Amino acid sequence: MADWFSSPLKTCTHVCDFPSLAGDPQQEIMCCDSMKNKLQDSRKVLLVSCSVSFNGSFYGGNRNVRGQLQISMVEDDGVCRPIGYVPIGGYLYHNDYGYYEGTRTFNLDLESQYLKKDEDYNRKFLVSILNENGLDSQCDLKVFIVHSIRIKV
């Protein structure tokens, strides 16, 4: 991995908005290097990490909400597997709005095969909300995801 340190760093950023957390919502995102036809030679891509931050709110009184923000990745064999979880939730005594927020970085270090100059690097991810207790239509969440990528010619 040391030979990657001098390679240029690029990021791929996504925002997933969940206005309601009823029914275990999920969104699909695509990490892409957008380097198709920009270089003269073939290249390799190193997917270094996936950084996740979120904030959200819930409403109610005497309410305990709890769940997990799950990030999954479609691997080379076509199977979607979790790369990590971030807990979400909180508790309210009074009828009011409660807020939750969090952040986590998942180190991936996934190296691609050589890509031709006329193709993009693509990796599909799935952002899911897992309800463990009380996440419903009175809960919302906005998720920000940044993939760090290194490119080596």
From Swiss-Prot:
Cellular compartments annotated: Host nucleus; Host cytoplasm
Cytoplasm in keyword set = no
Q: Where is the signal peptide?
A: none
List the record's Gene Ontology CC terms alphabetically. host cell cytoplasm; host cell nucleus
What keywords tag this UniProt record? Host cytoplasm, Host nucleus
- Glycoprotein as a keyword? no
**Pfam families assigned:** Nanovirus_C8
| Top-level lineage group | Viruses
* Similarity comment: family membership: Belongs to the nanoviridae nuclear shuttle protein family.
Q: What does this protein do?
A: Putative nuclear shuttle protein.
Q: What is this protein called?
A: Putative nuclear shuttle protein
Its source organism is Faba bean necrotic yellows virus (isolate Syrian SV292-88) (FBNYV)
Write the gene name: DNA-N
